[in-house]
Design a protein with these regions (language model features):
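N-terminal periplasmic "start-of-domain" segments of outer-membrane beta-barrel proteins
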Residues: 28-57, 84
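Short acidic/polar hinge/loop motifs at secondary-structure boundaries
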Residues: 74, 102-130
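Gram-negative outer-membrane beta-barrel transporters
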Residues: 358-359, 448-450, 468-544, 571, ...
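Flexible loop and strand-edge segments within Gram-negative outer membrane beta-barrel domains
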Residues: 195-201, 205-217, 225-306
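Outer-membrane beta-barrel signature, preferentially recognizing the C-terminal barrel domain
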Residues: 250-271, 393-394, 398-452, 458-486, ...
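C-terminal beta-signal and adjacent terminal beta-strands/loops
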Residues: 198, 451-452, 494, 541-546, ...
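Extracytoplasmic beta-strand/coil segments of soluble accessory domains associated
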Residues: 63-102
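N-terminal periplasmic accessory domains that precede
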Residues: 62-65, 83-86, 98, 112-118, ...
């Protein structure tokens, strides 16, 4: 990443005067976030927030965090390799990743690789289940993952340093500093992860060959309040990584893959009584280089640069009613070794409403329409209600129409791209039951999703081409449980999730590949004074790896778990020393056919927090 590459998007944003959205939460101190729609228009759906204590318990990758704490299933081509999710039985391209309110799914592949995001760079990670295309656009069918940075406007100066070392020469470094006053707030974090990743296979000869990787990331946020009504905030995230792709057989040619992602966003927010006006400009760049033989310097590449402008106007006449209009424009410019150089323009308009009628009942509604010359986009809608029948029981209902647009690879691949593709579209409905009694929360949500015009690459005349062919029906149930209790110096918490998922091709009646019928997680933590310990449990059910559901090739169900202990040696400042035992049961398992995961291994770390 050169200095020119870093400065250019900032200049582009300043020149475009399309700045954007923000809001405030008043608590003991003022905390500012960008993705305010997540809070204002998600009351009728399930939103699971994973705070910094949960983030720090897990490995730094987004895959590890979500795999052990949510119902989302992940298929991972070996530790640290390509990782893709299945949320409510949908494909990886039907799960949206939202960075501070901006959809960052790849324009080339249509999905996000969850091993290219370091969770410790963010203050909060939230999981929003169900449709969200009315708010967040393409891919938000199964659900969306939200990565948020926060700004505190209070006099403070803090520093955090974490160093870890583990099996297979796995090393990690994370440093974050934050400074703020009542007018200015800024934070910067730097993360480095690397591993030889040469673990031995369990129960058989051989080891993970050519699996080494490293990645670096920088996350920066800075905000300034010009007055009580106007503020400006800059968000920036840079990621650079290299992974050697693990071999199935030692005789295979060794390959590697380089990722470089740059995301910059400038926001202006004006609070004018009942109106909140927001302008946003963002510049995103994704680029990859694939080396088909690491013995040579030749590579293929792909690159997409995106400019996003958004205007957001929120009208809030009182605490019970909100109406939000959003206008946005996106330009994607792509080029690469195997795609035709193309520029795509997309305009969109959204209308969102949230209304509380009394103390027990509220509803949410939304409409969205996109316009582009590349394909015909459907009118999207969402409608949800929430009613509190009793202090301990709340019922939620939600229905929505969502979609996923074709990617640059789908449309413009030189050897088979199809410019006549239509977006995938889905209709879904869900019912959530939430029970809350003192320190216990338990929720059960049932859902049904119907997807049409699903994209598939199929052989046509000796050439593979994408077409709109499949229809998919998905239904199931999700259960979430949480309990926390503090008695004097003792604190205990228990969290659990369970997902039952049926996702079948309507033509064949077969379950989609890499979608388990069952997944369950649980975590138990206990602390007394300066000592704490935890245990994590993960169960993934059997999955099909062939579209004809031939059970001969199934991946068996597996159970694994992690354990850890930590002690704080500090007083005014925090000096924590911790140890983790990963795959504590030494389970022999894979999540992708023939891509073995490591057995029992360890990690030790030290975390220093000082002011």
């Amino acid at each position: 990443m050169t200095l020119k590459q870093f400065i250019l998007p900032i200049m582009l944003m300043l020149c475009h005067t399309l700045l954007a959205q923000q809001d405030t939460i008043m608590q003991l101190k003022e905390v500012v976030i960008s993705d305010t729609q997540l809070r204002n228009f998600s009351a009728t759906q399930s939103v699971q927030r994973l705070n910094d204590s949960v983030i720090n318990t897990n490995a730094s990758s987004l895959t590890s965090l979500l795999n052990y704490n949510t119902v989302i299933y992940f298929k991972e081509n070996g530790l640290g390799m390509v990782s893709s999710p299945s949320f409510r039985g949908t494909t990886a391209q039907q799960t949206a990743v939202i960075w501070n309110g901006i959809n960052i799914n790849s324009q080339l592949l249509g999905q996000t690789d969850f091993n290219t995001l370091n969770t410790r760079d963010f203050d909060a990670v939230s999981v929003r289940a169900g449709g969200g295309s009315v708010i967040y656009g393409s891919s938000a069918i199964g659900g969306s993952i939200h990565l948020n940075s926060e700004l505190d406007y209070a006099d403070a100066f803090t520093n955090e340093l974490r160093i870890n070392y583990g099996s297979f020469s796995t090393q990690g470094l994370h440093y974050k500093t934050a400074i703020s006053t009542d007018k200015f707030s800024a934070s910067v974090s730097v993360t480095r992860n690397s591993s030889d990743n040469d673990y031995d296979y369990i129960g058989q000869e051989g080891k993970n060959i050519n699996g080494q990787y490293y990645n670096n990331s920088i996350n920066a946020v800075a905000g300034y309040k010009f007055s009580s009504k106007n503020r400006l905030v800059l968000y920036s995230y840079l990621f650079d990584g290299e992974r050697h792709f693990s071999l199935i057989f030692p005789s295979e040619i060794r390959t590697k893959y380089r990722d470089s992602n740059m995301r910059n966003m400038l926001e202006w927010v004006g609070d004018y009584g009942k109106f909140t006006s927001k302008l946003k400009a963002a510049f995103l760049q994704e680029e990859y280089r694939y080396f088909a033989n690491i013995a040579y310097q030749e590579f293929t590449f792909g690159r997409v640069q995106s400019i996003i402008g958004k205007y957001d106007l929120l009208f809030k006449p009182n605490e019970k009613f909100k109406i939000n209009t959003v206008l946005d424009f996106t330009q994607n410019k792509g080029n690469g070794s195997d795609i035709i150089n193309k520029t795509r323009h997309i305009g969109a308009a959204s209308l969102l409403i949230s209304h509380e009628l009394g103390s027990r009942f509220m509803y949410e509604a939304g409409l969205r329409k996109e316009i582009t010359n590349n394909y015909e986009s459907p009118v999207l809608f969402s409608l949800g209600t929430k009613y509190q029948f009793a202090p301990f029981y709340t019922l939620k209902l939600n229905t929505s129409k969502n979609f996923r647009i074709p990617t640059f690879n789908d449309l413009y691949w030189q050897e088979g791209g199809n410019a006549e593709l239509k977006p995938e579209s889905s209709w879904q409905v869900e019912m959530g039951n939430v029970f809350t009694v003192k320190d216990v929360m338990f929720s059960v949500t049932g859902y049904y999703i119907k997807i049409k015009d699903m994209l598939r690459w199929v052989p046509t005349g000796g050439l593979w081409r994408p077409i709109n062919t499949d229809r998919v029906e998905t239904y199931g149930a999700e259960a979430l449980f949480s309990y926390s209790k503090t008695l004097g110096v003792h604190a205990v918490s228990l969290n659990a999730t369970y997902g039952y998922t049926v996702s079948k091709n309507e033509t064949t009646g077969n379950q989609l590949i890499y979608v388990p019928y069952h997944k369950a997680t649980a975590s138990l933590s206990y602390s007394i004074k300066k000592f704490s310990a935890y245990y994590q449990f993960l169960y993934n059910g059997e999955v099909f790896t062939r579209s004809d559901n031939n059970s001969r090739y199934n991946i068996d169900a597996y159970t694994t778990g992690n354990a850890g202990v930590e002690y704080n040696f500090g007083n005014a400042n925090s000096y924590k020393l911790g140890a983790q035992l990963l795959n504590a049961w030494n389970a022999d398992y894979v999540s992708v056919d023939s891509r073995y995961m490591p057995g029992r291994n360890f990690n030790i770390y030290i975390t220093l927090k000082f002011k």
